[in-house]
Amino acid sequence: MRRSMKKGFTLIELLIVVVIIGILAAVAIPKFANTKQRASRASGLADLRNLATAQEGYFADSSRYGVTVDTLTFLNFRSSNGNRNLTILAAPGGWNATIVVPGPQTCGIFVGLAPGRPGGMPATNNDGVPVCW
């Protein structure tokens, strides 16, 4: 007697596996697609917090706030990533800091509490519209 020794997967089984992999990819890829953007944003927020600490240290030493990032280097303030542009703008009774991140970003506003800005007022443009990051 002769037996048929065919081994392997049928076309239907292979198609089912491909569909399952496609469904998993459709769920997983959007979940992790903006991971780099979120990490960059978290690093930028940490830079802003460190900048606020450095500004308060500078104020305690010289009775005024620093007007450039370079004035804070003696306090060992360094931006965590060279891909951002961090600037300080002197304001009446305080200062404003801006971080510009290259590339497309979804809208978000970070407001920190600082002296001279009670309640954490958001930064605004010339039209009074909150600046988005």
Where are the language model's segments positioned?
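Aliphatic-rich helix starts adjacent to a transmembrane/signal segment
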Residues: K31-L48
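Compositionally biased non-globular segments, especially hydrophobic aliphatic-rich helices
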Residues: E13, A42-L45, N126-D127
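Regular, well-ordered alpha-helical segments
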Residues: A26, N34-Q37, T53, G57-A60
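N-terminal single-pass transmembrane signal-anchor helix
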Residues: R2-F32
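Periplasmic/extracellular, small/polar-rich flexible segments of pilin-like filament-forming proteins
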Residues: T53-W133
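Hydrophobic transmembrane-helix microenvironments that flank and shape a buried ionizable site
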Residues: T10, G44, A52-T53
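Short amphipathic alpha-helical/adjacent loop interface patches that line ligand
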Residues: M5, L48, A52
